[in-house]
């Protein structure tokens, strides 16, 4: 999301005294502009809880290692729930996370560049095939418009699997309705 959009959202949040839970798991995988966290905007740190982790940025999917940053009073309450409801990440995962934070920046940059190359390739190929596609500015998902095929995204995914042996995830799994039927 662009900084100007975040600033507009922040104004509404401050006006109505709302807290923000900001999922920033893809913050290191943005391609056009550097990620801006809403917590960095004036008056937003004290009303923002940032959720992040290592699964996307450091290719540590399955390690179940993440973190939350925010006002101490909120984080302390989250910790109370977490301590008694959820087991902690294994110590090996925690050590790997520390290593990723200390020495993983170059790896993240290489992955981001690789993902961006794949993104550009897919967008180019979809355009060649005559399929419009929302251009993602981060992460590693693309959502081509399949409306011309007259199928739901589930039907389309099943058809691709059965006829082309290509497995894809239907757009509805991501809440994407515009590009699914």
Question: What residue spans do the PLM features occupy?
Answer:
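PLP-dependent class I/II
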Residues: 1-181
């Amino acid at each position: 999301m662009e900084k100007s959009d975040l600033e507009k959202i922040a104004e509404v949040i401050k006006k109505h005294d709302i807290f923000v839970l900001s999922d920033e798991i893809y913050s290191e995988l943005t391609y056009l502009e550097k990620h801006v966290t809403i917590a960095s905007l004036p008056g937003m740190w004290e009303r923002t809880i940032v959720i992040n982790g290592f699964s996307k940025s450091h290719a540590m999917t399955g390690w179940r290692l993440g973190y939350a940053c925010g006002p101490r009073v909120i984080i302390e309450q989250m910790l109370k729930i977490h301590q008694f409801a959820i087991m902690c990440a294994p110590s090996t995962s925690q050590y790997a996370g520390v290593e990723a934070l200390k020495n993983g920046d170059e790896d993240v940059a290489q992955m981001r560049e690789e993902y961006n190359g794949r993104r550009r390739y897919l967008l180019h190929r979809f355009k060649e095939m005559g399929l419009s596609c929302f251009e993602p500015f981060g992460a590693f998902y693309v959502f081509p418009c399949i409306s011309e095929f007259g199928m739901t995204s589930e039907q389309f995914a099943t058809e691709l699997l059965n006829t082309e042996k290509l497995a894809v995830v239907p757009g509805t799994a991501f809440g994407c309705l515009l590009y699914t039927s």
